[in-house]
């Protein structure tokens, strides 16, 4: 999976940026805070979170790993998806979120449009233990860095994507390993498509 993009900002929208990498334009969704720091024509390095679904592949970009980690943490809360996670990160920095959760300050989250009292309470309750462990060099940060590491063999993210598409974890692991053994240079897109095609042909 794509873990990082380095390129020139070609264009920006309300919730996305197009990064030109060697003539290829990647549409990357980002928080308002991140977009506000980008300027067209300038070069940047963005850390990327890739979400794969049967109908699309979405890229989410971050200028620092801390924001990427909190993007994933927020999605661990029941009721928060990618769009809401970015919306919250457009209003609050990771440090703001950490302080609010540790202080059990629900009002910080309730002040964000679209976040009601129940969701604010869930954010505090469900992130309390996780956020408390986050600090520079903590085990959580190290684990998060490893999860999205790009390897030439089956990555956890590819397997997770196939599980989201209906595979059991065992099926996904076997499918990915088998395809890569036959074609080590296969692209991620083709890997997923081939796995889906092979599975459908077996039914």
Swiss-Prot record:
SUPFAM superfamilies (UniProt xref): DNA helicase RuvA subunit, C-terminal domain (SSF46929), Nucleic acid-binding proteins (SSF50249), RuvA domain 2-like (SSF47781)
Gene Ontology cellular-component terms listed: cytoplasm; Holliday junction helicase complex; Holliday junction resolvase complex
UniProt-listed InterPro entries: DNA_helicase_Holl-junc_RuvA_I, NA-bd_OB-fold, RuvA, RuvA_2-like, RuvA_C, RuvA_C_sf
Region (Domain I), start-end ranges: 1-63
Pfam families (UniProt xref): HHH_5 (PF14520), RuvA_C (PF07499), RuvA_N (PF01330)
Entry's Gene Ontology BP terms: DNA recombination; DNA repair
Annotated region (Domain II), positions in chain: 64-142
Disulfide linkage: none
GO molecular function: ATP binding; four-way junction DNA binding; four-way junction helicase activity
Alphabetized UniProt keyword annotations: Cytoplasm, DNA damage, DNA recombination, DNA repair, DNA-binding
Chief place where the protein resides: cytoplasm
Region (Domain III): 150-203
Presence of the UniProt keyword DNA-binding in the record: yes
Cellular location(s): Cytoplasm
Stretches for region Flexible linker: 143-149
HAMAP family: DNA_HJ_migration_RuvA (MF_00031)
Domain comment (free text): Has three domains with a flexible linker between the domains II and III and assumes an 'L' shape. Domain III is highly mobile and contacts RuvB.
Family: Belongs to the RuvA family.
The protein's assembly and partners: Homotetramer. Forms an RuvA(8)-RuvB(12)-Holliday junction (HJ) complex. HJ DNA is sandwiched between 2 RuvA tetramers; dsDNA enters through RuvA and exits via RuvB. An RuvB hexamer assembles on each DNA strand where it exits the tetramer. Each RuvB hexamer is contacted by two RuvA subunits (via domain III) on 2 adjacent RuvB subunits; this complex drives branch migration. In the full resolvosome a probable DNA-RuvA(4)-RuvB(12)-RuvC(2) complex forms which resolves the HJ.
Function: The RuvA-RuvB-RuvC complex processes Holliday junction (HJ) DNA during genetic recombination and DNA repair, while the RuvA-RuvB complex plays an important role in the rescue of blocked DNA replication forks via replication fork reversal (RFR). RuvA specifically binds to HJ cruciform DNA, conferring on it an open structure. The RuvB hexamer acts as an ATP-dependent pump, pulling dsDNA into and through the RuvAB complex. HJ branch migration allows RuvC to scan DNA until it finds its consensus sequence, where it cleaves and resolves the cruciform DNA.
NCBIfam families linked: ruvA
Name of the protein in its database record: Holliday junction branch migration complex subunit RuvA
Encoding gene per record: ruvA
């Amino acid at each position: 999976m794509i873990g990082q993009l380095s390129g020139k900002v070609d264009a920006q929208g309300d919730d996305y940026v197009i990064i030109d990498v060697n003539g290829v334009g990647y549409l990357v969704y980002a928080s308002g805070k991140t977009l506000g720091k980008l300027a067209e024509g300038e070069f940047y390095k963005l850390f990327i979170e890739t979400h794969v679904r049967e109908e699309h592949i979405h890229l989410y970009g971050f200028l620092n790993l801390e924001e990427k980690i909190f993007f994933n943490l927020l999605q661990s809360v029941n009721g928060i998806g990618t769009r809401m996670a970015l919306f919250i990160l457009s209003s609050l920095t990771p440090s703001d979120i950490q302080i609010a959760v540790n202080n059990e300050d629900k009002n910080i989250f309730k002040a964000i449009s679209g976040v009601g009292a129940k969701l604010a309470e869930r954010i505090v309750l469900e992130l309390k233990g996780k956020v408390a462990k986050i600090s520079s060099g903590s085990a959580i940060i190290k684990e998060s860095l490893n999860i999205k590491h790009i390897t030439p063999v089956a990555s956890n993210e590819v397997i997770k994507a196939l599980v989201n598409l209906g595979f059991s974890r065992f099926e996904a692991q076997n499918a990915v390993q088998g395809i890569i053994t036959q074609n080590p240079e296969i692209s991620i897109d083709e890997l997923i498509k081939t796995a889906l095609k092979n599975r459908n042909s077996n039914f």
